[in-house]
From Swiss-Prot:
GO terms for molecular function: lipid binding. The lineage of its organism: Eukaryota, Viridiplantae, Streptophyta, Embryophyta, Tracheophyta. Keywords: Disulfide bond, Lipid-binding, Transport. Plant non-specific lipid-transfer proteins transfer phospholipids as well as galactolipids across membranes. May play a role in wax or cutin deposition in the cell walls of expanding epidermal cells and certain secretory tissues. GO terms for biological process: lipid transport. Coiled coil: none annotated. InterPro entries: Bifun_inhib/LTP/seed_sf (IPR036312), Bifunc_inhib/LTP/seed_store (IPR016140), Plant_nsLTP (IPR000528). This is Non-specific lipid-transfer protein. It comes from Amaranthus caudatus. PROSITE patterns: PLANT_LTP. Disulfide bonds join C4-C53, C14-C30, C31-C76, C51-C90. Belongs to the plant LTP family.
Amino acid sequence: AVTCTVVTKALGPCMTYLKGTGATPPPANCCAGVRSLKAAAQTVADRRMACNCMKSAAQKTKSLNYKVAARLASQCGVRMSYSVSPNVNCNSVQ
């Protein structure tokens, strides 16, 4: 099951990137975390949990660049059914 600890650990290497301009590709260890998170979130419940964890972490992170955050998965070549934004409705995630 996906927990907020799993999400935080997976996305930890992305934090510096997510506070920047997104002018350079995300670091390899950040994309590895994104891929592991996608692999871990196999069920709708897992994906909703991951979404809620990312949303609350994003709200607590000062100077997070939401434009960069929204593109993170695609920059890493990963298809996600939702993006990180302050008003994403995690209950609608399939």
